[in-house]
A protein has these predicted regions:
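Sec-dependent signal peptide recognition
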Residues: 3-10
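N-terminal signal peptide c-region/cleavage motif recognized by signal peptidases
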Residues: 14-16
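Serine-esterase "nucleophile elbow" of acetyl-processing enzymes
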Residues: 18-68, 72-75, 83, 93-101, ...
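Conserved catalytic region of serine esterases and O-acyltransferases that act on ester linkages
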Residues: 25, 200-303
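Oxyanion-hole/transition-state-stabilizing segment in secreted/luminal serine hydrolases
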Residues: 31-32, 43-44, 73-76, 83-125, ...
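Solvent-exposed loop/turn segments at secondary-structure junctions
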Residues: 35-38, 66-72, 104, 111-116, ...
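A short helix->loop->beta-strand "cap" motif at the edges of active sites that frequently abuts
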Residues: 139-144
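Substrate-gating cap/lid alpha-helix
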Residues: 155-187
Length: 303
C-alpha cells in the first residue's frame, strides 16, 4: 500500500463498517436553503469528504439553494431595489421533492425570514409556521429531514437593528423542537467568531454581515460533519488538510466544485422558481453527461 493511501486509511479509521457519512444510508441527499446554500461551499466540502472517505459508495448529492428565498413567505418593501420580491419556498418545494425524490434533506432557513428587521412575534410566527410546514412536507414525501440553524448576522459599525438577536431566537427555537434532528451551526459560528475577535477586533466571518466567506463555510461544514460522526474533523483547519492524503487535494476539490455548481444550476432551471436574475443551467441530459465525465476524474483520485 502506498504511503499516501496508507495515510488516507488511517485518517478515517473507525468508520470502516459505515457505508457513508449520512445516517440511514440514503441514495439521494438534498440540501435546500437560501443564497448561503446556493453559494454551496459548505455543501461542497461535505460532498468532498463523503466521496473521499467512501469512494465506492454511489450516492447523489443535490443542492437547490435559492438566493433571497424564505420559508416564512415574507419580503421587505423594496427588496432588491424593487426589482422583485423574495421567492417563497412554498412555491417550489413540492416540485423539488417530486423531481429529486430525496431520501434525506438538509434544510437551512432563517437568515432572510425576519427580513432584516428587529424581533417581532408576527414575523417569528411566520418563520415557525414555515419551518413546521416544510418539516411535514418532507416527511410526507417519505424523506428524512435534518435542520440546520441559520448562520450569523454581523452588524455593521453604528448599526443597531438587533438582527443578530433575531437569528439567535430563531436558532434557539429550532434546537428546542422535540424529536427533530437539528445541527446548530449558528452557535458554532458564534463561538468561532468570539474566539477570533479576542485576537483581532476587526475580524468578520462575512464581509457584508450575511454571506460567510470560505472560512465561515468551512466552520459550517465542520460542525455538520462533526454532528454526522466525523470526530476527526475537529482537528483539521482547512479543506486542504481534510484532503491531505491526496497527491493534489486542490485539484480534487476543484473537480467537486465544478461538477457541483454545474448540476446545481441545471436542477434549479429544470425545477423552476420565481427568482429572477439567476444563471440558466444546462439541460439535464447534457448536465448529466458532463457530471459523469467529472465523476470519472474524481474517482481517479481514490483508486
Amino acid at each position: 500500500m502506498g504511503k499516501r493511501l496508507h495515510l488516507f486509511v488511517l485518517l478515517f479509521v473507525g468508520f470502516a463498517v459505515q457505508a457513508q457519512i449520512f445516517p440511514g444510508n440514503p441514495k439521494r441527499v438534498l440540501f435546500i436553503g437560501n443564497s448561503i446554500t446556493y453559494a454551496g461551499r459548505y455543501v461542497q466540502i461535505i460532498e468532498a469528504y463523503q466521496r473521499a472517505k467512501f469512494p465506492s459508495q454511489e450516492i447523489d448529492i443535490y443542492n437547490v439553494g435559492l438566493p433571497s428565498e424564505t420559508v416564512s413567505g415574507l419580503s421587505e418593501d423594496g427588496h432588491a431595489s424593487g426589482r422583485f420580491p423574495r421567492p417563497d419556498l412554498h412555491e417550489r418545494l413540492a416540485r423539488v421533492l417530486e423531481q429529486i425524490k430525496p431520501d434525506l434533506v438538509f434544510a437551512t432557513y432563517g437568515m432572510n425570514d425576519g427580513i432584516y428587521l428587529p424581533l417581532d412575534e408576527t414575523r417569528f410566527q411566520k418563520f415557525k409556521d414555515g419551518i413546521l410546514w416544510m418539516h411535514e412536507q418532507v416527511h410526507a414525501s417519505g424523506a428524512k429531514i435534518i435542520h440546520i440553524t441559520p448562520s450569523l448576522y454581523e452588524e455593521k459599525p453604528n448599526e443597531n437593528i438587533g438582527y443578530g438577536k433575531v437569528l439567535d431566537e430563531y436558532s434557539h427555537w429550532l434546537t428546542q423542537q422535540k424529536n427533530w434532528q437539528v445541527i446548530d451551526t449558528h452557535s458554532a459560528l458564534q463561538k468561532y467568531l468570539n474566539a477570533e475577535l479576542k485576537k483581532n477586533a476587526n475580524f468578520r466571518i462575512s464581509k457584508d454581515g450575511v454571506h460567510p466567506g470560505d472560512e465561515g463555510h468551512w466552520m459550517m461544514a465542520k460542525e455538520i460533519l462533526r454532528y454526522l460522526g466525523a470526530k476527526k474533523i475537529n482537528r483539521m483547519n482547512s479543506v486542504e488538510e481534510m484532503l491531505e492524503p491526496f497527491k493534489d487535494p486542490k485539484a480534487y476539490f476543484d473537480l467537486i466544485v465544478q461538477r457541483h455548481n454545474m448540476l446545481k444550476d441545471s436542477w434549479l432551471t429544470k425545477i423552476g422558481h420565481k427568482r429572477p436574475e439567476m444563471k440558466m443551467g444546462l439541460p439535464m441530459q447534457e448536465a448529466n453527461l458532463k457530471a459523469e465525465q467529472w465523476m470519472k476524474q474524481i474517482k481517479e483520485f481514490t483508486r
